[in-house]
């Protein structure tokens, strides 16, 4: 099949690779290059960069719905368009008469919106998955053609879940394209009574007071926000982003110390919460690199026994 691929984020990389191997990708459309890093160097999206490596024609429009770009994309006369983490809304005029499907990072109708993977982790869900849907006027409300699910591990962060869900993409996209080619594709209408929203993340959500939340809530929020914005705390006099934690039970929490209202960091990374305790596994000092809690404390043994206090991230 002739495929137009519209995507920007790394979530679509496994599916793009699979499509190149099994179909004819006639064009890739991605977001424009953006400044990145300390040097603010113009950098292509992960999809645009990989497409260029594969020798695929790449367009990077500021607005894919602009008349000239619309004509160019439609001019490929593809059999199907595959849309994954593209970042622009596709107009009715662009999609008119086109078979287009979208890979979404949740089991729809749950978690429609911008941050489905992070919200599933933050809500403490036991499982999540991906859905292949038709494109509709309302966000993520199209017909569901296929789904695939997987459990969310107790230590998994939203980054972990993102990467694992991305690997489910080729299977479900391949299934849908095959059924479309055979004329047997049927979609299921979403149950609006079960629809939930996955609103965009904000820096304000990254402030966490471990003395005021349970270990379960702390684990879910910290692991869900690990990539951005990250839950930052002050341990002694050092500001640290908590990247990965696990629950270690109420009994564990009873053995942990506290000073005033603030819990203390134990040598094994355990910190008491309002109910139970968490064990910090990975951290990133502000301005530094990510490391295990062991590596962090080996270089800063004075922080063992120090209070862990909430701080608001910059710009919150």
Model-found features: residue ranges?
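N-terminal beta-loop-helix "entrance" segment that forms/cooperates
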Residues: 34-54
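Donor/substrate-binding cores of folate-linked one-carbon enzymes
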Residues: 80-197, 204
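Acyl-group handling in specialized metabolite and lipid biosynthesis
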Residues: 199-213
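An anion-binding loop in the catalytic cleft
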Residues: 211-316
């Amino acid at each position: 099949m002739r495929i137009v691929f519209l995507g920007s984020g790394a979530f679509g990389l496994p599916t793009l690779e699979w499509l190149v191997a099994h179909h004819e990708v006639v064009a890739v459309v991605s977001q424009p290059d953006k400044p990145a890093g300390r040097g603010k160097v113009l950098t292509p999206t992960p999809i645009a960069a990989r497409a260029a490596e594969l020798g695929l024609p790449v367009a990077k429009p500021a607005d894919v719905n602009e008349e000239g770009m619309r004509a160019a994309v439609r001019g490929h006369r593809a059999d199907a368009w595959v849309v994954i983490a593209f970042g622009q809304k596709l107009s009715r005029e662009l999609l008119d008469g086109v078979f287009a499907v979208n890979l979404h990072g949740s089991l729809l109708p749950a978690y429609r919106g911008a941050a489905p993977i992070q919200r599933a982790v933050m809500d403490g869900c036991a499982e999540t998955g991906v859905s292949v849907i038709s494109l509709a006027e309302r966000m993520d409300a199209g017909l569901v053609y296929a789904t695939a699910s997987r459990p969310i591990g107790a230590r998994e962060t939203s980054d972990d879940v993102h990467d694992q869900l991305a690997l489910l993409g080729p299977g479900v996209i391949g299934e849908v394209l095959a059924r479309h080619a055979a004329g047997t594709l049927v979609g299921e209408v979403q149950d609006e009574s079960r629809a939930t929203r996955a609103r965009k993340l904000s820096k304000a959500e990254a402030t966490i007071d471990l003395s005021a939340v349970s270990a379960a809530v702390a684990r879910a929020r910290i692991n869900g926000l690990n990539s951005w914005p990250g839950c930052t705390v002050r341990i002694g006099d050092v500001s640290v982003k908590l990247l990965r934690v696990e629950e270690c039970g109420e009994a564990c929490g009873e053995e942990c110390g506290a000073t005033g209202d603030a819990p203390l960091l134990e040598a094994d990374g355990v910190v008491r919460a309002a109910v139970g305790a968490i064990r910090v596994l990975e951290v990133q000092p502000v301005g530094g690199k990510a490391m295990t809690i062991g590596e962090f404390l080996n270089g800063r043994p004075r922080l063992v026994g120090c209070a862990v206090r909430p701080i608001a991230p910059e710009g919150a």
